[in-house]
Amino acid sequence: MKVSASVKRRCAKCRIIRRHGIVRVICENPKHKQRQG
């Protein structure tokens, strides 16, 4: 899980999701998991 100021899709399968005010990226590839914070 990467915590970064700006979350970006790193591949076509990445999905940007907003949960409880936190922006997350979920993907099949675990290396692409990100969270904004």
Curated annotation (Swiss-Prot):
Residue ranges that the Swiss-Prot or TrEMBL entry lists as coiled coil: none
Keyword tags: Ribonucleoprotein, Ribosomal protein
GO molecular function terms noted in the UniProt entry: structural constituent of ribosome
Task: Choose one Gene Ontology CC annotation of this protein and give it.
Answer: ribosome
The Gene Ontology biological process terms listed for this entry are: translation
Query: Which HAMAP family does the entry link to?
Result: Ribosomal_bL36
For this chain, the family text in UniProt reads: Belongs to the bacterial ribosomal protein bL36 family.
Protein name, UniProt field: Large ribosomal subunit protein bL36
Organism of provenance: Thermomicrobium roseum (strain ATCC 27502 / DSM 5159 / P-2)
Q: What is the lineage of its organism?
A: Bacteria, Pseudomonadati, Thermomicrobiota, Thermomicrobia, Thermomicrobiales
Gene symbol?
rpmJ
